[in-house]
Amino acid sequence: MLLFLLCLPFLSKAQGIDIPVTSKTKLNFSGMLQSQFNYSLDHDIDIKGLHHSGDEQVSHNSFSVKRARLQLNATISDRINAVILVNFGDFTGNPQNKVLENAFIKYSINDYVNFQFGQFRPQFGQEDNYPVDFVQSIDYSNQYYLFGGNSWQSFQIGASFSGKIKDIAIPIEYSIGVFNGNNRNTVDNDDGKIFPARLVFGLSKETHLGLSGGAGKNMGQKIWAYGMDLDYKKQLNEKWGIKFTSEYKQGINSQEFFNQTTPVIPVSRYAMRGIYVLPNVSYSFKNTRLKDLEFAFRYEYLDADFKQSGNARQTYIPMLSASFAEAYAIRVQLGLMMDRYQRNIPNTTEYNTNRVICQVQARF
């Protein structure tokens, strides 16, 4: 952390600062800032999506710093690099077990053999392939956060083996790992581990099919999850481009099981599943400050406990995005988030909501 603070004065000068350490070692600093304005359109819903049945004063609009990330990437040799990623935006809330996101060492022998150790995101879905600043919606899916809370996605501590085979009719990317299974910045509390695996098939230059699956143990309970995703991207001409992403997942919701004081129902009865589709249309400009305009619409269905008293959540997010630099380095997004639950539960976040979100992003 001290290293980051000492280097902060230099971070505003360039996009990724290269600092030679030795003839073989090079440090690269980069950062990302996301700031939001949230406005609740419902008089009884606050900006966090919590329903209020009484007459208490609540906040219906607020500015916030969603993420303030700083990353150090150290290229130690032609085969070894180390990455540290912190999010200072976590200090706006409870920072316990947060702030530090990536902290790993990667050893790459060739395209076929790569090892990774430390804290990083397991490969278990399409959304694990890119940072949040490249998501073509306001944020990752609700599915991503639910499966992340159950240790299959988001930042976990462990090790993985990955690679890709390119020179065949259908190129294949593969990954398998072993992780503690109790989320980031936390010492393991049992001997159980989870084993996620993933295959991605390049069906064509534009189309990729991903298959994910995993099993393991958490506090002596057997858990599992699996998923499938499809990604299609095509540049129609110099100006127009389209992209379509869809993902389905299902698994054991061990988080819900362990939240109970005295669980009497077997963990296999706590099951979660979800699907989302995200079409995106982009229009590019040349020789102007405005580089791209995009329209995306995410539809998502998620049920965190579908075998018992589940309360299915459907989310609709139309979004307009304007990029003023290449690769979303400067981006302004305006979206409407509409949540619809199978049944409304008063004084909880499981209640129909409508929120306008404006997000401004800068990468450097």
Where are these regions (language model features)?
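Bacterial Sec-dependent N-terminal signal peptides
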Residues: M1-I17
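Outer membrane beta-barrel
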Residues: D18-D42, Q57-G181, D191-K193, V200-H208, ...
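Detector for outer-membrane/organellar transmembrane beta-barrel domains
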Residues: K48-G49, G202-D305, Q314
